[in-house]
Structure formats: structure tokens, C-alpha cells
Amino acid sequence: MRGGPCGGYPRRMTAIPDSTVGTNTAVAGLESTFADELGALTVPWQGAHAPDPTLLVLNEQLAASLRLDVQTLRSEDGVGVLSGSTAPAGAKPVAMAYAGHQFGGYAPLLGDGRALLLGELTSSDGQRVDLHLKGSGPTPFSRGGDGFAVIGPMLREYLVSEAMYALGIPTTRALSVVATGQNVHRYGAEPGAVLARVAASHLRVGTFEYAVRQGEVLQPLADYAIARHYPELTELPPGRDGNRYLSFFEAVVEAQASLVAKWMLTGFVHGVMNTDNTTISGETIDYGPCAFLDAFDPAAVFSSIDHGGRYAFGNQPVVLKWNLARLAETLLTLFDSTPDDAITAVSAVLATFDERYDGHYAAGMAAKLGLAGELVDRALVDDLLTLLEEHGADWTGTFRALADELRGHSTPLDGLVPREHIGPWLERWRGDLTKHGRGAAETADAMDCVNPLYIPRNHQLDAALRAATDGRLAPFEKLLEVVTHPFDRRDEWSDYTTPAPPSFSKSFQTFCGT
């Protein structure tokens, strides 16, 4: 979240510094189409000076895909840009304005309280992406916060977003984390840091919630979003019959239904599914209070501020649909000539969310169970989930153990669910597997390709971030290596498959630190 706690209202600063043109060429090729075309949704701004910036981690593979020179990024000029101290030559850094529903309550103005959009780059595959800094200092949207961030949460977002990318889940990505050399007061004094984030864009449901109340900017915003994310829709009529904008809404519904299904299949708990954290692109964004399931529990909540369990693991599809309804409300004036027709049209599209989600989830679960290409028996899935919940079985470990079961190795599964309880279910599952005629070994190998062995286990990530805060990066670097190879079994990584001990899980909480 931006600017202090995860909620609250912003206050405007009284002065806005000039957006000066720098001479630093460490990040070349930045464009500013969002700021140029939608200036009403931005405030020109500069990052705060970092007194002693030190590069902690650099995503060299991502840098190369953005056609950025790695050695230049590691130079003094490069670190200056990545820390927010120096604006790249020709850049027009801005803080982005948006609103949002936070835990169901509407906040009319949120915005980048500790972040800056430096501009856009074109990747080697021709995709336009944002380069965004997080923790770069106060902005007009800081809401009384200091605008800074600390090492632990920035490294957390770096590692988890890269793990999600390796898992094949749409996500923003991390280019770097730079320590600023300045302490920030959170739970005592902690070392400050800035994350450089790369995203398909930073357009959110909350961006539209803000724009709809700003007069003429809504339609240009919708057209920009379509051109950027769903260009196949640009040829549709833009008139008030709603073809283009209704199709745009449908595309976002589809993208988000697919995304949340992937979360549910992976055991990912986002933790703060506010509308300002729901992207138009369908990417996962904001990893502040996120976590991963160990024991399967639909009611699992890890966020310290989610007292009512609104964003519990099992609630995520319902919440996502609710967020999409808020997007629909902002687009009504673009759909049809009468309010009733507009509501009817958008409601019909929103009503398809459940079927879309169910389809993505069923296909994903079929693959996890080795039934890819087959219609999965809903009762088979539901009964497995009941068994896992009743016995507190590890979500990630269960599906790898099922593959081992097909190979004749029963010990892993026996350690998760007693044989006398899961035995009848296994017979039904094996019966379904025989229908597609694939051998047991081949099926097990296929399952291993979609069921990760390594995820960012909560206790291991927590330990790595504590060590990094104390100046020891080695545990973080090792965990990063492991979770970015989630399907590759290596004997030396066996410790990384172990769920957290019950004593840890009982008290573990996440915080909205990013």
C-alpha cells in the first residue's frame, strides 16, 4: 500500500517541485505516454535523495529483456536512477492518482504515496511496460506518511513476484532493490530501500474510480487502457452503443477470472485485495501482506489488518468479482444511451465471472491431478479438499505426493493424510486416470510440471528477510534461487519443501509494508 497505513485519506502537499530534465542516461529509451495523454491523472514529481545508495539485488535477465545494459545499471548513475535520486535523461516522473475501495470502504483519493512512474520501456518482444519506483519518498498523495520503504518489504516483493512469474502466474516483476543508506522508522529504525518494479501498466480499478469523478478523462483513460492491453478491441465502435467498452470490461473480467483461479490453485493469499490493487492488465500487484498456504484452509488469513477475514483465501474469487462490479460502475456512461440499458449490459457480462472462474479452476485442477484434457469430476475435487482441510495437509506437498503415489512411493502421502482416510478417494482418482490411457509414470511426470515443489514458504521467507535486514543477504539469495526454479527437484534443496512448524504458523502475520 501507499503512504503509511493501508487505508486513510491523502492530503495534498502545498508545493510541487519542477520535473527537471536530467542528464543521466543509465536508463535510456523511456517514454511517457501515460503522463502525456492522461496528465489529469498524474502529478509531476521527483524522488528523494538517497544519501548512500547500494544495489542489493538486480534482475539481470529482466534487465536484458528490457534492453537495459546490466553494467550500466550497476554503475553509480544506474544506482542513482534505481534509487530515485536521479531522474533519467528525458524522463517525466510522475505520481499517479487513483481512488479505491479498501476493505469495502471508498477512499476518493489514494494515489502513489511513496512511488513514482519513471516512464515506459519497450521490451525485446515489443511490449510496452512501466518502470516504477516504490519507496522513493513522499509525494502529494502520501497522506501524512513519510513516503519511504524498508529493506524487508521491498525484498519480499522482489522475491515473491519473481516466484509468481516462475510459477506462470501473471504478475508485476522486480528489476532491483537498492538500499538508500537512510534509516526509516517503522518498528524501530530499519534500513530504507527502493524497489524498481516493472508492470504491463499500473492501471487499476481504482484508476477508473478516480477518473469517473474527474469529468472528461474517463473515456480517454478507457481508450488508453484498450490500446495498451486489449488492442484487438480498438477497431470496435467507440460510440454509446457500448461495443468497445463493454468488450473491454469483458476482457478485464476474463483476465481477472483467470488470475484468481491461478492464485487458488497455487495456494496464494493476496491479503489486501482492495480495488486499487486490482489491475486492468490482469497482473498480480502489491505483495505487502501476501502469504502462501501451508495447511489447506479456506479461512486462512495472514494479514494483520484483515480482522474480519474479508480477504481470506477462500473468499478471493468472490472479492475479485465484487471489485469488478466497482469497475463496471465507472464505465456505465460509456456503454449505452440509457442507464437501464447500460446496467443490463454490464450486469450480463459480470454474471459470466463465476462460469469463467469455474472453468479456469477446473482446468487447472484437472492438470494438477493428472487429468489434463479430461473433464474433472467436481465431487472428486471437493472430496479431496475436504480431506486436506480435515487433516491440515500441506497444499503444495499434497499434489507432489500424489505424483509420487503413482510412482509407487507412498511415504510422502502417508505423512499428510492417513491412508485409511484417503484410500477410497485414491481408488476413485485412479479410476478416472485410467480413462485417458496414459501410463502412471507419464502422468506423474506431467503432474510435476504443473505442481511446484518449492514456493516462498512463509517461515523461510520471514527468516530470509530478517537476515537481510540485519545485513546478511545470503539466505535471501538462496531462497530466491530456489523459488525461481519451482518445479526442479534438487536433493540439496530438500529443506525448502518443509512446511512451517505449527508453532510458527499459529502466530504468523503479514504486514502492509510495501
From Swiss-Prot:
Pfam families: SelO. It is an enzyme of class 2 (transferase). InterPro entries: SelO. Its cofactor is Mg(2+); Mn(2+). GO terms for molecular function: AMPylase activity; ATP binding; magnesium ion binding. Mg(2+) binds at N277, D286. Its EC number is 2.7.7.-, 2.7.7.108. Keywords: ATP-binding, Magnesium, Manganese, Metal-binding, Nucleotide-binding, Nucleotidyltransferase, Transferase. Signal peptide: none annotated. ATP binds at G111, G113, R114, K134, D146, G147, R197, R204, D286. The active site is at D276 (proton acceptor). The keyword Nucleus does not apply. It catalyses: L-seryl-[protein] + ATP = 3-O-(5'-adenylyl)-L-seryl-[protein] + diphosphate; L-threonyl-[protein] + ATP = 3-O-(5'-adenylyl)-L-threonyl-[protein] + diphosphate; L-tyrosyl-[protein] + ATP = O-(5'-adenylyl)-L-tyrosyl-[protein] + diphosphate; L-histidyl-[protein] + UTP = N(tele)-(5'-uridylyl)-L-histidyl-[protein] + diphosphate. Nucleotidyltransferase involved in the post-translational modification of proteins. It can catalyze the addition of adenosine monophosphate (AMP) or uridine monophosphate (UMP) to a protein, resulting in modifications known as AMPylation and UMPylation. Belongs to the SELO family. This is Protein nucleotidyltransferase YdiU.
